[in-house]
């Protein structure tokens, strides 16, 4: 008797669960700055940079001091204290890199022109160094820093060789960094260097410290202000250094917000906000690359006149998407705050220490999951399917169940249990014992203990369930009596476990809100003081004259955005739809037609205009799966249903809003859901994701809609009807199921062309009406192995064409072949009168095929009126000018009508492949015009499917045609050779 392998489950019920968790032992890592330290605003000017530091800052390996104060720059030279300088960021005290440095293990590459001199000074050796996989490792041991060679990634430094000289003291190095006697002179290696490859290292990590996003934004504001000013004044020497500074800050932003890490490890797919974050990030990098290429593609940085407008356009495009990215991060704690403050269990993170439990060997938390909240739905889904399958097995199990069925029960339970165990084991709870979170130890102590007890209870119950299923494999063991009790206990245990985890998150959220509030107040005080000092600064001098650059300038990146928009405080905990109120051009309209927009904005427009714009409603619900998923659409509808009130409402205004706009919005959301389920729910009802979505919809409707709206019960009934609806009766399937022997002696040519044309029209229309709308949208016919209704129709049309060719060639004498040709010409003409363009096209295609077209002797005997008729039919199906004649006839055709399938498929393919998914003018907006065109084509097909023919059906003739077409010879080479044997080529 086979048993599923239980070794992989690593069951722990007999080993116990350790309830004490020690603080993770975080290893020591070398710390490096990924941004230059600006000690003087003039450092951005090329005239202040020495030749030996051509467009580059100095990066030197360092380590943490033992006295507890971290030196985030290692032995990086710093300006001398007696040097009078003005920081380019006056609201920052000291170097802003003290707050934004990253603990990244990097190495350095020597300049091809000058090797590095031995490193001296107060640099300390680190007991451990982790080398990045895509960087060059040191050529000598790290403890021996003499003559060591390192490389620095292009994503974290300036382009081109870096030359440093550490033979002098720190103060001399500092003076060397800021020496001003030489001007900027790019070299050949600099010009030919690759441009900014993004990091692809496993050592990218998520920051565990507080990130003040507004300070980042102010840095970009300052740099963009001066960059756009330099472009406007055509200050060619300042542009390269400003672009490089932007590059360094962009790397810092993506590094410290965790964007690089999440994209590299494909973790954004776990979030409902994946699309907007990834969409704007995918736009930021190309636009910045374009700006970089334009900047550094000119030798000696002599820009032609036409380059400056292109530079300005590229910079503005980059700024535009960067603002979206900033605002999106700031207003979604689900994205930014979670990675900075909340339990963040991320695989392969370089910090986190080790911890043990259940008597197992120590497992590094680098391999554990640090994203706790997104894991809850995944675990919930696994538990839900386990319980659902167990219920089905109990219901269907009997004393006479065969071995294969019992093995299926055992395998399924074992597989689901294994998934649940793996997900539970991947949760690293040691984050709650971090030294920075000591304030919440008392609050979390009870929750932690409850979590451990409940987790052990889940382990025990799952183990008992697996063992019980294993017992069924033994002879004379079919007792399922304890299964229902086990299932109920498992459900209760996991419900308690989820509640424990939610308690963790609530405690952390309260603490984080308090920390953010304090940080925000502290920053606002510094910001107000910094603005006062900044207004007293002298105007910045440029080579074109004196220009005053202030925060109210047209070039300022902050522009109309307020500080509150970018503050990570309590007010940032809002849905993504609230972001649309802060930004413009989210939905683009032309002549009352929606051309495009972001997904949340399109859903919002759908809800607000569900009764006013029926064309948009139909197009959206018909094509939504081409740009989103059912789960995401449902999530956005739920967010709109729970729409937040506008800020600042008093009790009276709130009551008015709740009874007015909010009530209408909720009612419209219910209307959209009802239409979606009733007419546009094209999902596979056997798929797991569909079952889980339907379960969520039921819960939402039962808990939130039914108590307030009667339509909630209607939608629940429609969901139940999804399984009770029977597929439409198919004439072709019934005919194909009839035996072939009945029709062997049937003579097709005993029927008139009119009768044959009418029966073919009924067959073609039956194939057409079997095609659901989703197959037109998703192009299910592309794969030849597809079993879609469109593919069945295509196969029948092709087989019918080959059958006509075989019917003509199977006649031994010329007169007989002539009679068959005339029969099908007259049939095609009758199809034209019936507006059956599909059969018409198949017949003409067969007569135009190489094996038939060359039968000149047979065509000479065809009547003149039939030849004239064939000539007119050929003009109708002529392909030139994109079937212009056929399209004109189709527009005038009245229902019922059978269109030519090939033209429909061509139009759908052209629309799908010939039109971008986003707007050319606004790449961050989805192109809804493309979806409108798809919906228009499908609407025409649905119109043809709606009206059927009222003709008598001849099942004998129809069955004969179907069976003959099913087994027809489609070897064109054989058919052509047979044609040659009947009418050899003339000499």
Swiss-Prot record:
SUPFAM superfamilies: Ras GEF. Residues 1-50, 100-130, 529-552 are annotated as: Disordered. The modification Phosphoserine is found at residue 552. Residues 19-39 have a biased composition (Low complexity). InterPro entries: Ras-like_GEF, Ras-like_Gua-exchang_fac_N, Ras_GEF_dom_sf, RASGEF_cat_dom, RASGEF_cat_dom_sf. Keywords: Chromosome partition, Cytoplasm, Guanine-nucleotide releasing factor, Phosphoprotein. Its main location: cytoplasm. Residues 752-985 form the Ras-GEF domain. CDD domains: RasGEF (cd00155), REM (cd06224). It holds the Pfam family RasGEF_N. It is found in: Cytoplasm. Has a role in chromosome segregation and cell morphology upstream of the ras1-scd1 pathway. Promotes the exchange of ras1-bound GDP by GTP leading to its activation. This is Ras guanine nucleotide exchange factor efc25. The gene is efc25.
